[in-house]
Each structure stands twice: as C-alpha cells, then as structure tokens.
Regions:
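Short secondary-structure capping micro-motifs at structural edges
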Residues: 87-93
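Divalent-metal-activated hydrolytic enzyme cores
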Residues: 10-41, 76-83, 95-96, 111-173
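Ordered, amphipathic secondary-structure segments that act as subunit-interaction surfaces
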Residues: 94-106
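Conserved beta-strand-loop surface patch within small alpha/beta domains used
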Residues: 27, 31-86
Length: 173
C-alpha cells in the first residue's frame, strides 16, 4: 500500500496501524483478499461512511471482498451533480462493468439533522480562518446546501436515487 498522512507527524494510533500493516504484508495476510478490480456482482453501493457499517453492511448483504464497488461518504448522499460520488459511479459503470446501483442508508445517521452553521462554528473554533470561509462563499460555494444534513432518512435516499436515475451521464439501462 502507498500511504501518506495528512498530519505533520503520525499519531501513536497511525503508527500502530502502519506497524500492523507491515506485519500483515510480511506474513502475506492479504492473499485471502486477492481479487481483480471488477466487481463480481456488477453492483455499486453508495452508503454512509459510518464506522458501524464497516463490517455490518457486508455481513447484512452477504457480500465479500471483490463482490461490489463500495462508495462511502457522509450520509450516503450526492451533494454535487459532477462531484466525486457521480465520478466514482461513472468509473464504476463505464470502466469497471457495474450494471446496478444501490443506495443504502441507516438509522441514527450522523448526517441526519446536521446543520451548516454549527459546523462552520466548529471550523472556526478549530482555527479555520473566517476569511477563507467568506472567500469560498464569494467563489460560489453554498455552505448551507453543501454542509447541511437531512431531516428524513427515507426522503434522502429517495432523493439520491432520483438524482442518479435522472442524471444525464448515468445510462438508463
């Protein structure tokens, strides 16, 4: 694996993970996970990045490594018509043979009831310069639509599915 950490120096937790990885590679622990890049079930799943879903979602769906393309983000939503989620779906469809897309949500999602104003205040409290936030707003970034969560999980999933179904670059077949 190739890895770079965002922080200036690795935390003890990251160092522990990297040490584990070195042993994992040395002992060839990866061999049981070897597969190719094409999903066997020809399915892409858009879901939330919630840590509770890491092992639970594959177990609940009966999928294993190599079965599907998993795309995860906060809330399992599409926040931009030409952002990274749509790009990932296009790559999955046109380059990796995906034929079906599932959108999966879960209860007690952290993106549910998320409010942009609260997040902007947390950013400022962590040292993000208010001038940068203002500059991004001036450049056309609508923080409210970008950072706000959703109030109704089912409505959010239906909206995301509708967005995908009607996207001009997603094939209708």
């Amino acid at each position: 694996f190739l890895y770079f950490c965002v922080s200036k120096q690795n935390s003890a937790m990251i160092e522990e993970m990297l040490a584990y990885n070195r042993e994992f590679v040395k002992n060839e622990g990866y061999k049981e996970y070897i597969t190719n890049k094409y999903p066997d079930k020809k399915i892409a799943i858009l879901s939330c990045m919630d840590t509770r879903l890491t092992a639970l979602l594959p177990a609940a769906l009966g999928i294993k490594n190599g079965d599907v393309k998993m795309i995860k983000n906060a809330g399992g939503v599409i926040s931009h018509p030409f952002g990274s989620v749509i790009r990932s779906l296009l790559v999955a469809i046109f380059e990796l043979g995906v034929e079906e897309i599932m959108v999966i949500a879960h209860s007690d999602c952290g993106a549910c009831h998320m409010h942009s104003e609260e997040m902007l205040e947390k950013m400022k409290a962590r040292g993000i310069n208010a001038d940068y936030i203002h500059m991004m707003s001036f450049c056309g970034v609508d923080f409210h639509s970008w950072l706000d969560g959703f109030e109704d999980t089912e409505k959010s999933v239906r909206g995301t599915v509708d967005f995908i179904v009607h996207h001009p670059l997603i094939p209708s077949d």
